[in-house]
Structure formats: C-alpha cells, structure tokens
Amino acid sequence: DLGITFESSLMDEYHSCCNKCMFCFIDQMPPGMRDTLYFKDDDSRLSFLQGNYITLTNMRDKDIERVIKYHLSPINISVHTTNPELRCKMLHNRFAGDVLDKIGRFYEAGIRMNSQVVLCQGLNDEEELDRTISDLGKFIPHMESLSVVPVGLT
C-alpha cells in the first residue's frame, strides 16, 4: 500500500448515461434523496472496475479500442433487446441500435462479456426475447452469461 488515495477511483469525470430508458429505476426515484442516488452512470471503466452494467451507447470508437487494447475484461452490457428499432425505442436513444456491432468487436478481440435484459411485458418478451437469446448465443464463449430481470417499479 503506497498510502495514496484519489478523490475519484477514475481520476477524471464519470460518464453519465445519455439514455432515457422506459424502465429506469433512477428516473422513478422520489425527490429529496441524496444527489449521488440520482446519478446514472454508463461508464465502461466502472463496468470493468466495479461490475456495473452499461448500455454501450456512450462508447465511441476510441473507447472501444481502449477496452480492446488493454483487454479490460469482463465488460457487463445492458442489452435489453438485439432488435435495433426496439432497442432505440426502449432506451429512448436513436443511436442505441448498434449493440450487436459493438458486442461483435469485443467478441473478435476476446473480451469476456456478461449481458442483461430488463424484461418488459409486451415489448421485449416472447419472440423478441427468443431473438435476443439467439443473437447473444452466437458470441459464446466470450458472452459468458445472460441475466433476464423482470421490470420493476421503485
């Protein structure tokens, strides 16, 4: 132990989430809580360091290349659906549809991944869930897990 402590474990600014997911628990929190509870992180560094799940929508090419270059693994990905149009709708982000391309880049580089789906009845269940499971299964063995979590209200 060198006795050095940093104000932030990342030593620079955290990357906040740019999505407005229809199921986001942070957006459902009551007012008047401490500020840190309202911060929505979507930072690949926190995925590696602390196991946080990220949507990949904040990741630019240089961010993806950094993960690959330094083999920051595993990375935990909030997928929700592999249907590009539906993913854009669920995340309220018109740029969210390229998740399979990004996962493919990590796969080709041997980056280990875990994924999750927040299951919303009538949206990403049934055939859409089957499609997502099938699509993500193509990335085995580097796609190590898929968690399916039912949507909840806080």
Locations of regions flagged by a protein language model:
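Conserved Radical SAM active-site core
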Residues: 2-143, 150-154
